[in-house]
Every structure is written in structure tokens, then in C-alpha cells.
Amino acid sequence: MSRSVALAVLALLSLSGLEAIQRTPKIQVYSRHPPENGKPNFLNCYVSGFHPSDIEVDLLKNGEKMGKVEHSDLSFSKDWSFYLLYYTEFTPNEKDEYACRVNHVTLSGPRTVKWDRDM
């Protein structure tokens, strides 16, 4: 009996230790198709490798939050880190700047990654 109690306590301690591991998100911003000015496309922000799961992600046009942004369900990898895809339809042109802003407990403040149309 005491052995099973000890194993249960050990299991709970090891599970609670999983929450202590914090991982910084990797942020990738890209379009679904090669960009052509004036042609509709999709802007994607793939955020991966982060832990814990609480995260804020915004797609930006000229520094302002874009509307009608959708996202995938929160998923996790084999290493128990999380990943998400945020996306929205947009029409690229030469004058507008697009970016993805992410805020997570592992960051000192929000991190913004600009979309590079040449990627």
C-alpha cells in the first residue's frame, strides 16, 4: 500500500514539473502563395515550440490589428511544446506592411515579426 502511495506521489511530482518548463515561441510569418501585388492571398503566422500554452497572437497591417483572423486548434508536439497557425486573407501591395505580434510569458514584452515578401 505504501509503495503505491509513494509511486502516486512521485507521478504527481513529475507531472507538476512539466509546467515549470518554459519555452519561447518560434514565430514564422509567410504568405500561402508567392505574393503578387493586387492578387488575393493568405497571410500566415505559425507560432511553435512554446510552453506554457497561454499565448496572444495578432496579425497586423501597418501596425493595426487585422480583422477576420482565424486560427487552428492549439496542438502539441512530441516534446509537449505547443503550436498554432493564425491566418487571414489579404491583398499585398507595395505600400502596406504586414506583421505578426506575439505575447507570451517567456518574452519580456510583445515580439513583432514582419512579413518579408521575398521569403
From Swiss-Prot:
A biological process from GO: cellular response to nicotine
Record keyword Transferase present: no
PROSITE patterns on file: IG_LIKE, IG_MHC
Subunit structure: Heterodimer of an alpha chain and a beta chain. Beta-2-microglobulin is the beta-chain of major histocompatibility complex class I molecules.
The protein's name in its UniProt record: Beta-2-microglobulin
GO cellular component, one term: extracellular region
Signal sequence, start to end: 1-20
Similarity comment text for this entry: Belongs to the beta-2-microglobulin family.
Cystines in this chain: C45-C100
SUPFAM superfamilies linked: Immunoglobulin
A single MF term (Gene Ontology): protein homodimerization activity
Signal found in the keyword field: yes
Keywords, ordered alphabetically: Disulfide bond, Immunity, Immunoglobulin domain, MHC I, Secreted, Signal
Function comment: Component of the class I major histocompatibility complex (MHC). Involved in the presentation of peptide antigens to the immune system.
Localization of this protein: Secreted
Species assigned in the record: Macaca mulatta (Rhesus macaque)
Domain Ig-like C1-type, chain residue ranges per copy: 25-114
Lineage summary: Eukaryota, Metazoa, Chordata, Craniata, Vertebrata
